[in-house]
Regions:
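Aromatic-enriched alpha-helical interface/lid elements that frame and gate functional surfaces
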Residues: 65-138
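A short catalytic or substrate-binding loop motif that flags glycine-/basic-rich loops and adjacent residues
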Residues: 60-62, 98, 167-168
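Active-site-adjacent "lid/gating" segments in soluble enzymes
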Residues: 1-77, 81-82
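Terminal low-complexity tails and localization/encapsulation signals of metabolic enzymes
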Residues: 54-55, 65, 71-72, 114, ...
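Short, well-structured beta-strand/strand-turn elements
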Residues: 136-150
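Short, solvent-exposed loop/turn segments at secondary-structure junctions
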Residues: 35, 84-86, 148
Length: 174
């Protein structure tokens, strides 16, 4: 429902722009099914490209390694290595002795289990705050509870929660 609403908003705005430019109207046809299918993004495209049925991967990204949640000594955080340069930077910071094939994302994808196992062993020994500090400049962030996310200083600064007639509610992000 939420994804469909977001797509509907985009469609309505596009139709309004089209009407403004051409004076003609548009018919919008949107379905929950179509929007849910479009949200499959990487997994669906991988199926179409390879013919292979994707398997459950938890929080892991199907095409990037490492790009998933890892457990630290005090909770979970997400590490999102999106390039070989970020990988190399992390390897240098953590002083990881790794295989040459891991220097490329394709090599890390092929050896996903061993790459992730290596990192799980490292990350479990220190706190999330420690890893955020060590990995500054490399995309990573804690996995928050809903309460932590709502009370986070960024949520507070951005006004993520409104009070309407004494009832707290999520704010419109726009």
């Amino acid at each position: 429902d939420v994804i469909t609403g977001l797509h509907a908003t985009s469609a309505i705005l596009a139709a309004l722009l089209y009407r403004e430019r051409t004076g003609k109207s548009q018919r919008i046809d949107i379905s929950l099914w179509d929007c849910a299918i479009s949200a499959l993004v990487n997994q669906a495209q991988n199926k179409l490209a390879s013919g292979k049925e994707p398997q459950p991967m938890g929080s892991a990204h199907p095409n990037l390694v490492p790009y998933r949640a890892f457990e630290a000594s005090d909770g979970w955080f997400v590490l999102a290595i999106g390039s070989d340069a970020q990988w190399q930077q992390m390897v240098e910071i953590l002083e990881i002795d790794c295989r040459e094939s891991w220097s490329t994302n394709s090599g890390r994808v092929k050896d996903r289990i061993e790459v992730e196992r290596t990192l799980f062993k490292i990350f479990k020994n220190e706190t999330i705050t420690h890893w955020e500090s060590m990995l500054e400049g490399i995309p990573c962030a804690p996995v928050n509870t809903i309460g932590q996310a709502l009370s986070d200083m960024q949520s507070v600064a951005r006004g993520a929660v409104w009070s309407v007639e004494g009832v707290q509610t999520l704010a419109n992000p726009l």
